A protein has these predicted regions:
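Donor nucleotide-sugar binding/catalytic pocket of nucleotide-sugar-dependent glycosyltransferases
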Residues: 66-111
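Nucleotide-activated donor-binding/catalytic signature segment of Leloir-type glycosyltransferases, i.e.
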Residues: 166-185
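Short hydrophobic beta-strand element within catalytic cores of glycosyltransferases
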Residues: 220-223, 228
Length: 315
């Protein structure tokens, strides 16, 4: 509240994540709001998950959230059109909303993958350890394929304070699971290139940052077919999708990759390397942090009256 009191009428406030937006809106509730405010919703999060308690909470908070969002924000920015439609309808939002499909990635520090193995491919899931990220589906897949020509790795930590987070006892079970290699936290920029295939099994995403980083680095990616993955990464090479987080379909895709002619005749470095080069070019032209910051700057210019209108360059 101290921060909101110090704001001037011509300031622009840009808030990231729905949770932070609601906290800002609550702090802003009892002041005469003269600032221009933007909320970027990077994913709808726990409140819009399939968790029973979350569903009840969403109903109870509906009127309150509708009032907060409409009073406090001039612009809502989403990362996919399903989230846009869902939350605009829920909050009865009457302002302007647009799509900017990612927060962007900083590519300078990312170490690029140089070679692809043709046996004992390393599969990784790198994520916060919460239920809706598909952790247990990934464990089931690793158990199903424990005798295959793949090695399964899990990177990430439990998310303290998140009601959907795995418990310490569940994490201990993962550490003792012989089908999986638990890594804990890793430095994505320096370590991800050591793996061959990245799996994203999230049940919801605004936009998957790890997927974009993996495609830039050069990993082959298989993702659950949800708006937060397909809306962006369907434009890339070396990217495959599975409907409904189907474990058998993930297995089939992995087997198809290892049986690809490029692996069989040892030309995988050229085949997947060319796809990775294409991905890096596409990301450098459209989806780096610098490019996304430039897109937001156009919104700031519009709110300051420096340009007459704003239209998102992303479709």
């Amino acid at each position: 509240r101290k921060i909101t009191k110090s704001l001037n009428y011509d300031d622009i406030v840009h808030v990231y994540t729905l949770k932070s937006g609601l906290l800002f809106a609550f702090a802003n509730l009892f002041r005469n709001n003269k600032t221009k405010n933007i909320l970027t919703i990077t994913g709808l999060g726990y409140l819009f998950s399939n968790n029973f308690k979350a569903k009840i909470l969403k109903i109870l908070l509906s009127f309150f959230i509708t009032h907060l969002i409409n009073k406090s924000f001039d612009f809502l920015i989403y990362q996919n059109n399903i989230d846009q439609k869902t939350f605009n309808n829920y909050s009865k939002y009457n302002g302007e909303s647009y799509i900017i499909p990612t927060s962007g990635i900083t590519v300078k520090e990312l170490q690029i993958k140089k070679e692809y193995r043709n046996s004992n491919l390393k599969i990784i899931m790198a994520t916060r350890l919460i239920n809706d990220k598909g952790i247990f589906e990934y464990l089931d897949l690793a158990d199903l394929m424990k005798d295959s020509d793949f090695e399964f790795y899990l990177a990430g930590d439990i998310d303290n304070g998140n009601p959907d987070s795995l418990s310490k006892s569940q994490l201990d079970e993962i550490k003792n699971n012989k089908s999986i290699n638990y890594l804990g936290h890793i430095d994505i920029s320096k370590e991800l290139h050591n793996y061959d295939v990245n799996l994203v099994m999230s049940k919801y995403e605004g936009s998957s940052r790890i997927l974009l980083e993996s495609l830039y680095i050069g990993l082959i990616c298989i993702s659950n077919n949800i708006p937060g993955t397909t809306a962006l990464s369907s434009k890339f090479s070396n990217s495959f999708f599975v409907n409904d987080n189907n474990i058998q379909e993930f297995k089939r895709n992995l087997n198809e990759i290892i049986n690809n002619d490029a692996f069989l005749d040892s030309t995988q470095n050229e085949f997947f390397g060319n796809g990775a080069d294409y991905n890096r070019k596409l990301i450098n032209e459209n989806y780096t942090s610098v490019k996304i910051a430039a897109a937001y700057n156009k919104i700031y210019q519009y709110l300051r009256g420096e340009i007459e209108s704003y239209k998102s360059e992303f479709v």
